[in-house]
């Protein structure tokens, strides 16, 4: 993520937002619902590796999520109040990232899925879906992964054996096969 200055003002006409194409409303909702996962992952990162975490910001996002969740059925009826809650939630997510200096309050594994799909589509010259739609799908995949992880008992020896047997050349070949010309920049940051 790159730091950008916050805007001086935002103007959003909720009547216009409520009349937006339904796919755009769904994308906004998809991006907002992802915050359930991102806030949990942020807390886990704090507990496991000591990453910066702010409970006040996390609670700000949880409250925005509650309002979006409660208003979500109104999006189908194009209620301006529902569109307002989604817009406010997305704005608060941006503010939360600006306050913390990291994207964690608003972005987790689900966003990685979206970014990978975007890179792969760009590499192949294919169209991409709306960011919030992709993030919504990434949220469903993330939840499935989290559910699978609940059934795993950590095994230190197995992890150490995996590290010993890690084949960096095979991993690099896989990255190059999947990401083609984007692989060099990915490998440089790995």
Give each language-model segment a name.
Residues 1-66:
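A glycine/threonine-rich phosphate-anchoring loop and its flanking beta-alpha core
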Residues 58-190:
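Active-site segments that bind and position negatively charged phosphate/pyrophosphate groups
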């Amino acid at each position: 993520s790159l730091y950008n200055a916050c805007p001086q003002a935002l103007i959003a006409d909720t009547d216009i937002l409520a009349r937006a194409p339904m796919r755009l409303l769904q994308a906004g909702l998809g991006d907002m619902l992802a915050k359930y996962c991102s806030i949990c992952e942020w807390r886990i990162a704090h507990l496991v590796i000591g990453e910066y975490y702010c409970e006040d910001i996390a609670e700000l996002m949880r409250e925005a999520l509650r309002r979006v969740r409660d208003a979500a059925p109104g999006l189908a009826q194009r209620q301006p109040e529902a569109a307002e809650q989604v817009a406010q939630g997305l704005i608060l997510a941006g503010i939360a990232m600006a306050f913390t200096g990291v994207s964690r309050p608003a972005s987790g594994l689900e966003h990685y899925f979206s970014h990978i799909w975007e890179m792969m589509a760009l590499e192949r010259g294919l169209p991409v879906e709306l960011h919030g739609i992709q993030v919504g799908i990434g949220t469903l995949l993330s939840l499935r992964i989290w559910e699978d992880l609940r059934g795993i008992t950590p095994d230190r020896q197995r992890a150490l054996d995996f590290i010993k047997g890690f084949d960096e050349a095979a991993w690099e070949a896989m990255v190059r096969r999947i990401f083609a010309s984007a692989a060099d920049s990915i490998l440089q940051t790995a």
